[in-house]
Amino acid sequence: MPTTWLRRCLPVLPLVLALGCGDSSQPPVPVTGKITYRGLPLQNGTIVFTPDPRKGSSGNMAMGEIKADGTYSLRTGKDFGAAPGHYRITVAAVLGSPPSPGQPYTYQPSLLPEKYRDPELSGLFCEVKGGFAQALDFNLD
């Protein structure tokens, strides 16, 4: 009887394997952009692109430091850019600057509403398409 089970499952096996695997052969593509809050450039912070499993994306997060002019460039680990796919976006920015190495951490108030720190609540989504550099700007209110 095991051969009957195998005959039933064998035609479906490639589909099951394909669903469980992401396309890791696509290299990261450069992603840059600008973050504004209430119409003005956000002057510091971090932006994080988290793969959106509801849209079939998986893999590593990409993140970038927001510079004084509101611009950012993403990195995924040591690589510049982000892998093609769908992402949920979070943005965090605090008043002041982070402590120097060896200095104790002190609480610093957020410059943004807390919803922007949560990928489920931020309302920020995007798709990174493969094959070309992209500029993705986000206007926060």
Q: Across the structure, where does each feature detected by a protein language model lie?
A:
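Beta-strand-dominated extracellular/periplasmic modules and repeats
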Residues: C21-D141
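Sec-dependent bacterial lipoprotein signal peptides
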Residues: M1-L19
